[in-house]
Regions:
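Short glycine-/polar-rich loops that comprise or flank the Walker A/P-loop
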Residues: 32-35, 110, 124-127, 159-163
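Conserved helicase/translocase motor-coupling segment
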Residues: 20-99
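A short beta-strand element within the Helicase C-terminal
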Residues: 115, 123-135, 154, 163-164
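Conserved RecA-like helicase motor-core motifs
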Residues: 82, 99-116, 224-228
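Helicase C-terminal subdomain and adjacent C-terminal extension
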Residues: 14, 27, 137-229, 237
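Short beta-strand-loop-alpha-helix junction that forms the active-site gateway
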Residues: 236-261
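ASCE P-loop NTPase helicase motor core
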Residues: 1-18
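Conserved helicase motor
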Residues: 85-89, 114-120
């Protein structure tokens, strides 16, 4: 049983790493965007290939906005905030940059912790901001390092209420792997969230043409079909007659990963 994270935050990990064995005990909250990816268009890594200053600037700007808004709306019950990056050089520069915009008092008040995934093992925060520090000029070895399953799993499951990803490369241009799959999952969530807030919302928004074809085939047989339903921490592709779950796998190749607790 999992009590920490809202369903969208834990769903990817539950499916990719745990085979759906986790039972998520928290209910979804659609009042606020839970997952987000910020692509930094001018981001690039410097000489050591792991420090990305434009990405740090974008993250620190967003951090400051979060703190200012929280101080205005919720001064007596501040949110806790964590900042994660896979790379030590990025972490050290983040510490320097954050200290320039937030006082020591504010950092303590919001329990701001900055570190690698190792730092956050067994820990959690209300909001997590993750700097993947990956850009068009990054070395391929960097991607191999940041996609180590155990550490990747820790990085994406520390947030209780919100997880914001920062990356300096279009996720669609990433090589096949965990990071691309994960950011694709986040994009699907963002698209569905945006539609749910628009006047043109249609609950039957499909991930791909195959899923739509399967859903229509069941409707033609007289069944009621709903798409993208959160069930115990898993996002079911299709639910038929509120009784049966259909997973439309095989349309997009994904590498299965196993991770230990």
């Amino acid at each position: 049983e999992h009590f920490r994270s809202l369903p969208p935050i834990i769903n990817f990990s539950n499916k990719e790493f745990y085979g759906g064995r986790i039972k998520v005990m928290r209910r979804n909250d659609n009042s606020k965007k839970v997952l987000e990816t910020v692509v930094v268009p001018d981001g690039k890594v410097d000489f050591d290939a792991t420090r990305n200053l434009p990405e740090i600037e974008a993250l620190v700007k967003r951090l400051h906005e979060i703190v200012v808004e929280d101080e205005r709306k919720n001064p007596d019950n501040p949110v806790s905030i964590g900042i994660i990056s896979p790379f030590r050089a990025q972490v050290e520069q983040l510490k320097i940059s954050v200290a320039k915009v937030l006082s020591e008092h504010m950092m303590e008040k919001h329990q701001i912790e900055i570190g690698t995934a190792h730092t956050f093992q067994g820990d959690e925060r209300d909001i997590i901001l993750t700097s993947w520090a990956y850009a068009n000029n990054s070395f391929p070895q960097s991607l191999i390092f940041l996609q180590k399953p155990n550490l990747f799993n820790v990085a994406i499951t520390r947030a209780r209420y919100q997880l914001i990803n920062f990356i300096s490369k279009d996720p669609r241009e990433l090589p096949e792997g965990i990071l691309r799959s994960y950011l694709g999952f986040v994009q699907e969530y963002e698209d569905r969230y945006a539609l749910s807030k628009s006047d043109d919302f249609d609950e039957n928004v499909y991930k791909n043409a195959f899923e739509k074809e399967v859903a229509q085939a069941f409707r033609d047989l007289g069944h009621e079909v709903t798409c993208g339903v959160d069930i115990a921490g898993l996002s079911a592709d299709l639910v038929v007659d509120n009784k049966f779950v259909i997973e439309c796998d095989g349309v997009e190749d994904k590498t299965p990963c196993k991770v230990s607790n």
